[in-house]
From Swiss-Prot:
Residues at which ATP binds: 65-67, 84, 134-136, 140, 183, 197
InterPro entries in alphabetical order: Kinase-like_dom_sf, PDPK1, Prot_kinase_dom, Protein_kinase_ATP_BS, Ser/Thr_kinase_AS, Ser_Thr_kinase_AGC
Residue ranges of the region described as Disordered: 24-43
Organism the protein comes from: Schizosaccharomyces pombe (strain 972 / ATCC 24843)
EC id: 2.7.11.1
Entry similarity comment: Belongs to the protein kinase superfamily. AGC Ser/Thr protein kinase family. PDPK1 subfamily.
Name of protein: Serine/threonine-protein kinase ppk21
Length: 551
């Protein structure tokens, strides 16, 4: 049970856990088993065995919206782990208990498979939850893609095989990951794959564990824009085959250097996904092409299964039985055996598409008619793809991080149907009497007296800047809005801080502070509308001067 009034989670809501194999490997009797629901509140089942005091905590090696992952060393065994520390107060406040449980329960179900990051313990104190995880010291797949741009064919083949093997095991246990991407694929000390981040996984009911890959289940929009499958966009459903779509996207990115479906905003990405608009470089190994043509299909039932993928020519040299005991090939760049130059790829960068924008766009996209895309895809035996020499120009990551719920789809109902939301982000709004003298932003003691209110800022394609809050019964409404194209509206960005800006109209002034601490991701969009207002005002002034001269 949750004590919402005092922002507490009882221990029965998130019972502790210890991996049985952890004790058996040491010849110990495991006094703790995965917990049932009849737990006495306020007690810790393994508190006497493991607690924060049993570890030496080191550097932060990862963080999320309500958790941090720290490198830690067991004081008795001196073995290193990655401990995920979660804030209980935030979990309750943001209704994340479900997702915390999903992550723990998924990892408990998958524990022991070599391609899945292992959960050894969970324990807690009054303020925090602790997940003791297997340490993956060699980082994530994305960093190697960034470093080498195009991975060697042998690397791609071996790691694609390990990822596929891990997906096969997940599905056999009734787990759909729903957010497979290079950031969630780690490497252990021997450079073998470790899939992690199960906070948005879907745990299937027992009767559906062995269901066909194309069986669909209702799903909210979770995941990452560049890797989501068409069925999530069109019908708000997910299947085991959705993970295989994402798998194909990851393999493509390993060998090409960028995701197959990318764009400047979520809508562009989703349109490309639904129309199967992707390209293949001319230097791509011919054996790998069927992997993409058989997985990039609109209908889940038209995609190849895991067993069929294993039989593709690209994996002909893979020995599946001892895959996890083999020595991985050295990580290196692709080196063609023939004298064809690979053009220089532009520098890698992350897109400015926010998680909120991706969720909003997905909601809008799902409501649009896409039947024509599906009918076209059904008539095609194989999708038509273009072949080109140069790698794709750029790619980005519109990421919905683990445990982060998508922005409420009702946001789109708050603006006229003729407008599109091009940016949505969490901000703090502080009303002030007027623009500070000399355009100086408050600092020091004066900042303490500002009344900050957390809101969601929506920016539309016509220059509307609206601030949304929740009323009674969780009803969303626009508390205030300004027209950035209005010549009476003043927008000033703080030259000394990248996290805030100021808006003033004829009546009121507000300081807007971005929750993430970075307003640069949408600064240009706002200034573009403000420039339009300035040009209109300038033309109006010139016309008045001309009229006065004629008089």
């Amino acid at each position: 049970m949750m004590d919402l009034e005092h922002k507490r989670i009882s221990r029965s809501t998130l019972p502790d856990y210890a991996d049985p194999d952890y004790f058996e490997a040491r010849g110990e009797r495991n006094p703790v088993k995965p917990q049932s629901s009849n737990v006495v509140p306020g007690t810790s089942h393994i508190g006497s065995i493991k607690s924060p005091a049993d570890y030496v905590f080191g550097d932060i090696i990862g963080d999320g919206s309500f958790s941090k992952v720290r490198r830690a060393t067991d004081k008795k065994s001196w073995k290193e782990y990655a401990i995920k520390v979660l804030d209980k107060k935030y979990i309750v406040k943001e209704n994340k208990v479900k997702y915390v449980n999903i992550e723990r329960d998924s990892m408990m179900r998958l524990n022991g498979f070599p391609g899945i990051s292992r959960l050894f313990h969970t324990f807690q104190d009054d303020l925090k939850l602790y997940y003791v995880l297997e340490l993956a010291p060699n980082g994530e797949l994305l960093q190697y893609i960034k470093k080498y741009r195009f991975l060697d064919e042998n690397c791609v083949r071996f790691y694609a095989a390990e990822i596929l093997s891990s997906i096969e095991y997940m599905h056999s246990c009734g787990i759909i990951h729903r957010d497979l991407k290079p950031e969630n694929i780690l490497f252990d000390g021997n450079m073998h794959v470790k899939i992690t981040d199960f906070g948005t996984a879907k745990i299937l009911p027992p009767k559906y564990v062995n269901s066909p890959d194309y069986t669909t289940f209702p799903s909210s929009f979770v995941g990452t824009a560049e890797y989501v499958a068409p069925e999530l966009l069109s019908r708000q459903v997910v299947s085991k085959s959705s993970d295989l779509w994402a798998f194909a996207c990851v393999v493509y990115q390993m060998i090409v250097g960028s995701p197959p479906f990318h764009g400047s905003n979520p809508n562009n990405i989703f349109k490309k996904i639904m129309s199967l608009e992707y390209e293949l470089p001319k230097l791509l190994p011919p054996d790998i092409v069927p992997l993409f043509s058989h997985l990039f299909r609109i209908q889940p039932s038209d995609r190849s299964t895991t067993q069929q993928i294993k039989q593709f020519p690209f994996f002909a040299t893979i020995t599946w039985d001892n895959l996890w005991t083999q020595d991985p090939p050295p990580m290196q760049s692709f080196r063609p055996n023939y004298n064809i130059a690979i053009p220089n790829a532009p520098a890698y960068y992350r897109s400015n598409v926010t998680a909120a924008a991706a969720a909003n766009a997905a909601a809008a996209f799902a409501s649009a008619s896409i039947v024509k895309h599906q009918e076209t895809a059904r008539r095609q035996e194989l999708p038509t793809v273009n072949r080109f020499t140069a790698p794709t120009a750029h790619y980005g990551y519109a990421s919905l991080r683990s445990h982060q719920m998508p922005v409420d789809r009702l946001y789109y109902k708050l603006v006229p149907s003729s407008e599109s939301i091009i940016e949505s982000t969490s901000v703090f709004v502080s009303p002030i009497p007027s623009v500070p003298e000399g355009n100086k932003f408050p600092s020091g003691l004066s900042k303490m007296f500002l009344k900050r209110k957390q809101r969601v800022m929506l920016l539309t394609d016509v220059g509307r800047c609206a601030f949304v809050c929740k009323g009674k019964h969780e009803r969303l409404f626009i508390e205030m809005e300004v027209n950035l194209k209005d010549s009476s509206v003043v927008v000033i960005f703080d030259e000394n801080s990248s996290k805030r800006f100021l808006i003033e109209d004829k009546v009121q002034s507000w300081i807007i502070e971005d929750s993430s601490g970075d307003v640069t991701k949408y600064k240009d969009k706002i200034l573009k509308f403000a420039d339009v207002a300035s040009s209109h005002q300038s033309r109006s002034s010139e016309e008045n001067v001309e009229e006065n001269e004629e008089e």
